[in-house]
C-alpha cells in the first residue's frame, strides 16, 4: 500500500515518486495556498501506445505478440506466468477526461485514483486479445496459448479504489 509504507518491490521507484509528488503538492498548498489536484490513473491503453516489446505495457505487448505470431504462422503464443494475476485498465481518452474533471472540480492535492474499478485476469485478457486479433478462436484458444510458469506473474493484483473520485468528482 503506497500511502501506508514502502511500495511493493517491483513498483517501488514509481511508487516512491508518486508519494513524493503528493507531498510536494501538499507542501505548496500549505506554504503558498496553491490549488492543485492529484490524479493517479490505473494502467492506460489506447492510441499511440508503445508497442515495443522491450518496454511496452501488457495490452500493446499482447497485441503485437499476437500479430507477429500470425505473420510468422506460429501455432502458439507463449505468455509469461500463469495468467492468474489481475489488472485494471483505463482507456487513455477516459483518463484525459478524468484529469480535466479533477482540474475543474478539485483544489486539494488529496490523491484521487482514476480507474474503472473492474479487474481482468491476465489469462482472460490474453484470451480476449488473441480472439480480437484473430490469432485464436473460442475453439482453439486453449491449444494456442502456452503459459511459461517459470516466468513471474508480477504483482498478484492491481485494482484501484475509485470511491474518492466518485465522491469528489
Task: Go through each PLM region and give its residues.
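Catalytic helix-loop patch of NAD(P)-dependent Rossmann-fold dehydrogenases
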Residues: 1-45, 49-54
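Conserved active-site helix of classical SDR/Rossmann-fold NAD(P)-dependent CH-OH oxidoreductases
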Residues: 19-26, 59-64, 96-97, 123
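Alpha-helical segments that scaffold the active site and NAD(P)H-binding pocket
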Residues: 25-31, 63-67, 104
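Conserved catalytic/ATP-binding subdomain
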Residues: 53-57, 120
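C-terminal substrate-binding subdomain of Rossmann-fold SDR/epimerase-dehydratase oxidoreductases
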Residues: 68-169
Amino acid at each position: 500500500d503506497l500511502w501506508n509504507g514502502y511500495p511493493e518491490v517491483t513498483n517501488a521507484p514509481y511508487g516512491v515518486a508518486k508519494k513524493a509528488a503528493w507531498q510536494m503538492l501538499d507542501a505548496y498548498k500549505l506554504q503558498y495556498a496553491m490549488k492543485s489536484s492529484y490524479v493517479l490513473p490505473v494502467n492506460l491503453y489506447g492510441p499511440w501506445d508503445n508497442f515495443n516489446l522491450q518496454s511496452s505495457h501488457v495490452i500493446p505487448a499482447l497485441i503485437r505478440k499476437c500479430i507477429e505470431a500470425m505473420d510468422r504462422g506460429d501455432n502458439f503464443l507463449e505468455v509469461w506466468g500463469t495468467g492468474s494475476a489481475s489488472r485494471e485498465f483505463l482507456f487513455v481518452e477516459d483518463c484525459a477526461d478524468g484529469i480535466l474533471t479533477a482540474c475543474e472540480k478539485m483544489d486539494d492535492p488529496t490523491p484521487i485514483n482514476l480507474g474503472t474499478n473492474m479487474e481482468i485476469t491476465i489469462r482472460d485478457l490474453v484470451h480476449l486479445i488473441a480472439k480480437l486479433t484473430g490469432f485464436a478462436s473460442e475453439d482453439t484458444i486453449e491449444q494456442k496459448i502456452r503459459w511459461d510458469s517459470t516466468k513471474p506473474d508480477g504483482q498478484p493484483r492491481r485494482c484501484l479504489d475509485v470511491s474518492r473520485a466518485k465522491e469528489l468528482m
